[in-house]
């Protein structure tokens, strides 16, 4: 007889990451093409000398540096093993059986899985024009709503909500409901569409901003992210945190990235330029795609997404399908983008 497991896990799917195929071009996981800067690499190598010791579980130095970086006091900062772990902690401190967690859909695939794992109910509000429909989300709030996720830019559709609309939305949400603005891709926003998310934290004690070092800072393999929120929320997060999950190496790398933030963020300009080029080429080829404010583009190939991804894989290009809703394609190095565009222009399903 095997150990008895929670019955609700039986139909809960596991999170499926982007595939990796040896020898193929992988543009499925929104990774940066750039390796660490020499200064970041040096910090990593130095930290390796101390990996026989436990990391600083309070992240004192990193929290102080992050606080200075975002212009808050350290007690407004929480660090996690990637922002995805902070998503789980935020669900844990707000929601349990009978509670509801609200978000637009399609969005970050981990949200419904983490909500169901906590025993709560995910409430998925359909997107409008591939973007969070904030009015519809307000209408979906019930007396059981405990938490709202706003993924901005949205993963996988690449879109952002209007900054003023986001501010009005936060103002309209009842203050006992937590609003989490998940900004994993915020460094790629242009065109004046970046919200004053930290201003929302200062004005509303129920707002949390999540950011990560995995994307623009290039530390996806080291797993480190952070939350900015009211100190009461930060204190609650510490009660459900799994100790020592952000390693000494990842902390050292994050601090070095903050030291080199200007240089690292300059790299995003090259990504944005490629995003513009790739988007224009796809539209010229006949694809319909929303304007991207992330390091990826979204192809809403309804009913054809799996075939597109399979055919791309046969051409040694790995993209990320989302059911039959569409395909997410990471903006990569120019030669990798060219390989993808070569496939996309000649894809039989486009005819």
Curated annotation (Swiss-Prot):
Keywords, comma-separated and alphabetical: Aminotransferase, Pyridoxal phosphate, Transferase
Gene coding for it: pat
Subunit structure, interactors included: Homodimer.
N6-(pyridoxal phosphate)lysine PTM positions: 215
Organism: Mycolicibacterium vanbaalenii (strain DSM 7251 / JCM 13017 / BCRC 16820 / KCTC 9966 / NRRL B-24157 / PYR-1)
Chain's role: Aminotransferase that catalyzes the conversion of aromatic amino acids and 2-oxoglutarate into corresponding aromatic oxo acids and L-glutamate.
Reactions accelerated catalytically: an aromatic L-alpha-amino acid + 2-oxoglutarate = an aromatic oxo-acid + L-glutamate
Protein name: Aromatic amino acid aminotransferase
One Gene Ontology term of the molecular function aspect: pyridoxal phosphate binding
Cofactor: pyridoxal 5'-phosphate
One Pfam entry name: Aminotran_1_2
SUPFAM superfamilies: PLP-dependent transferases
Principal EC category: transferase
Family: Belongs to the class-II pyridoxal-phosphate-dependent aminotransferase family.
InterPro entries referenced in this protein's UniProt entry, alphabetically: Aminotrans_II_pyridoxalP_BS, Aminotransferase_I/II_large, ArAT, HisP_aminotrans, HistidinolP_aminotransfase, PyrdxlP-dep_Trfase, PyrdxlP-dep_Trfase_major, PyrdxlP-dep_Trfase_small
EC number from the UniProt entry: 2.6.1.57
GO BP terms: L-histidine biosynthetic process
């Amino acid at each position: 007889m095997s150990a008895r497991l929670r019955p609700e896990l039986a139909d809960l799917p596991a999170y499926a990451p982007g595939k990796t195929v040896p020898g193929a071009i992988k543009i499925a996981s929104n990774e940066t093409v750039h390796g660490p800067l020499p200064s970041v690499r040096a910090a990593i190598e130095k930290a390796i000398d101390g990996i026989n010791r436990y990391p600083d579980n309070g992240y004192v130095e990193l929290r102080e540096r992050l606080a200075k970086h975002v212009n808050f006091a350290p007690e407004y900062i929480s660090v996690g093993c990637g922002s995805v772990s902070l998503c789980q902690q935020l669900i844990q401190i707000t929601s349990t059986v009978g509670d509801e967690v609200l978000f637009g859909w399609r969005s970050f695939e981990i949200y419904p899985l983490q909500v169901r794992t906590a025993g709560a109910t995910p409430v998925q509000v359909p997107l409008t024009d591939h973007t969070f429909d904030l009015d519809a989300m307000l209408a979906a709030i019930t007396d059981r709503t405990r938490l709202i996720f706003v993924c901005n830019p949205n993963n996988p559709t690449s879109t952002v909500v209007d900054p003023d609309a986001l501010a009005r939305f936060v103002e309209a949400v009842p203050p006992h409901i937590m609003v989490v603005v998940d900004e994993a891709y915020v460094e790629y926003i242009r065109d004046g569409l970046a919200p004053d998310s930290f201003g929302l934290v200062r004005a509303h004690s129920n707002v949390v901003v999540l950011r990560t070092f995995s994307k623009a800072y290039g530390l996806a393999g080291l797993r480190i992210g952070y939350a900015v929120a009211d100190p009461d929320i930060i204190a609650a997060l510490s009660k459900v945190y799994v100790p020592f999950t952000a390693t000494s190496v990842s902390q050292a790398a994050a601090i070095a990235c903050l030291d080199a933030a200007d240089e690292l963020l300059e790299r995003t300009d090259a990504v944005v330029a490629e995003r513009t080029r790739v988007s224009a080429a796809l539209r010229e080829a006949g694809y319909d795609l929303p304007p991207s404010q992330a390091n990826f583009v979204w192809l809403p190939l309804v009913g054809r997404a799996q075939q597109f991804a399979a055919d791309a894989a046969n051409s040694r290009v790995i993209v990320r399908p989302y059911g039959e809703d569409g395909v997410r394609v990471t903006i990569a190095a120019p030669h990798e983008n060219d390989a993808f565009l070569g496939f996309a222009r000649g894809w039989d399903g486009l005819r």
